[in-house]
Amino acid sequence: VSILAFKKEKEIYAATYAWFTQVGEEVVVGLLGEQSITTHNLKVGDYCGISVCSKEQKDVALYIGDTHSNEVDKLLGLPYFVDSTGAITLKGSKVTMIAKVVDIIHLQGIEADSLVYFKVVEYHDNEKLDYLLMNDIR
């Protein structure tokens, strides 16, 4: 379970996503749902933070996933870091990445969703923490 977050034009966007995977040494791909305000505001060339949740972040992942960025400040009260590009990463995550959007593709059969290719420019792994899995939140 991962959280994608970024600041753009003074607005903060964050969403919980179930599927991100590494497909190259510095390339991550994510399938982002059509219903997400965050997905609609993500453009090629944007930088964003990808926080791979730790087991301790179950409630955070559920809260961010159950709300919309245009309705509430999803990160209010949460410890996070914003870098100079506007990428936001959550403190306490298993893995944090700063990534640049390289391409956004709409695949046949799931055109509404966005398959997003990211180039990872910064990567940190907290080896003391365990990954939050989908089975942990069902």
Which positions does each model-derived feature cover?
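Basic, polyanion-binding surface patches
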Residues: V1-R138
